[in-house]
Amino acid sequence: MSQEIGPTDAAGPRVCPIADALDIVGERWTLLVLRELAFGVSRFKEIQVNTGAPRETLSLRLRKLEEYRLIERRRYCEHPPRDEYVLTQAGQDLQPVLRSLREWGERHAAPAARA
């Protein structure tokens, strides 16, 4: 590993890529949104239903993911205006992370694992 993981100096820049990544994808609902997009779900309402995210929160998460270029918004209907969302290459690069989180959750966070 080329960079050390540890506490940061409050006066200096952070040098932890994990913390940097969590600044982007660590908010509630964000990883579930990325999961849905990885599954091929692309429309706002479907993402909202499948994740349970509140409408306003989902809008904020989608905007942030677009700002960080993890997703791209595409217009699929002009009247009324309707958009869909797709993963960019950077978003697709997170799929192994999502897979690992799912596997970890199955082993350690599922109700049977806690019993």
Predicted regions located by residue number:
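N-terminal intrinsically disordered/low-complexity leader segments
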Residues: 1-13
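N-terminal helix-turn-helix DNA-binding core of bacterial DNA-binding proteins
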Residues: 12-57, 78, 86
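Basic, amphipathic "hinge/linker" alpha-helix immediately C-terminal to the N-terminal HTH DNA-binding motif
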Residues: 26, 77-100
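Glycine-centered, phosphate/nucleic-acid-interacting loop/turn motifs that mediate DNA/RNA or nucleotide
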Residues: 29, 69-70
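Residues within the DNA-recognition helix of helix-turn-helix
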Residues: 61
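Amphipathic alpha-helical dimerization/coiled-coil segments
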Residues: 93-115
